[in-house]
Swiss-Prot record:
Record organism: Caenorhabditis elegans
Quaternary context: Interacts with nmad-1. Interacts (when monomethylated at Lys-14) with chromobox protein homolog hpl-1; the interaction is direct. Interacts (when monomethylated at Lys-14) with histone H3 (when trimethylated on 'Lys-27'); the interaction is direct.
Classification via Pfam families: Linker_histone
Name of the molecule in the record: Histone 24
Keywords tagged on the record: Acetylation, Chromosome, Cytoplasm, DNA-binding, Methylation, Nucleus
Keyword Nucleus (UniProt): yes
Gene: his-24
Lineage summary: Eukaryota, Metazoa, Ecdysozoa, Nematoda, Chromadorea
Residue ranges of every copy of the H15 domain listed in the record: 37-113
GO molecular function annotation: double-stranded DNA binding; histone H3K27me3 reader activity; nucleosomal DNA binding; structural constituent of chromatin
Length: 208
């Protein structure tokens, strides 16, 4: 009897350990099967306010409608409302959101203008600052290359003009001097013709 009691006591504690190990496995699998299918609520709220573009601010109901249409939040409306209220309250306390009207999770909400205005110029200034000096350097390089090319033909043109002006008076002066020298030579020719005419007339008179 004592041996059977010892065997029964040894077998009984082993069974619950195996059951406890099997029961622990499904809890780990359940945690892994719950991935978040949407961004954080504060990001969804900011996107909803930007897209709604209401000057007075977006209401909680309008934000909830936008979020449920554009994100996969599930079918549990009570849980979605609870998360949305918490996110709105935290956004106001952390100054990520501005409450334009109402109190708590009720009322209208906006995105701070300073944060939105600071992000847009910062993204716009960086490419503009990089592009402007490059364009200015190219323009100055082109101007420097073009200026000497334009100056060279001007110097050549002025040189040609000086040569032409110097040559033109020399050509006019030479023929004028030659014409003046030839005119007295032609006048001297008739004097030589008059002398032989007088000699021929004297000879026949001597023979008679």
């Amino acid at each position: 009897m004592s041996d059977s009691a010892v065997v029964a006591a040894a077998v009984e504690p082993k069974v619950p350990k195996a059951k406890a190990a099997k029961a622990a496995k499904p809890t780990k699998v359940a945690k892994a099967k719950a991935p978040v299918a949407h961004p954080p609520y504060i990001n969804m709220i900011k996107e909803a306010i930007k897209q709604l573009k209401d000057r007075k601010g977006a209401s909680k109901q309008a934000i909830l409608k936008f979020i449920s249409q554009n994100y996969k939040l599930g079918d549990n409306v009570i849980q979605i409302n609870a998360h949305l209220r918490q996110a709105l309250k935290r956004g106001v306390t952390s100054k990520a959101l501005v409450q334009a009207a109402g109190s708590g999770a009720n009322g209208r909400f906006r995105v701070p203008e300073k944060a939105a205005a600071a992000k847009k110029p910062a993204a716009a200034k960086k490419p503009a600052a990089a592009k402007k000096p490059a364009a200015a350097k190219k323009a100055t390089g082109e101007k420097k290359a073009k200026k000497p090319a334009a100056a060279k033909p001007k110097k050549a043109a002025t040189g040609d003009k000086k040569v032409k002006k110097a040559k033109s008076p020399k050509k006019v002066a030479k023929p004028a001097a030659k014409k003046v020298a030839k005119s007295p030579a032609k006048k001297a020719a008739p004097k030589k013709i008059a002398k032989p005419a007088a000699k021929k007339a004297a000879k026949p008179a001597a023979k008679a």
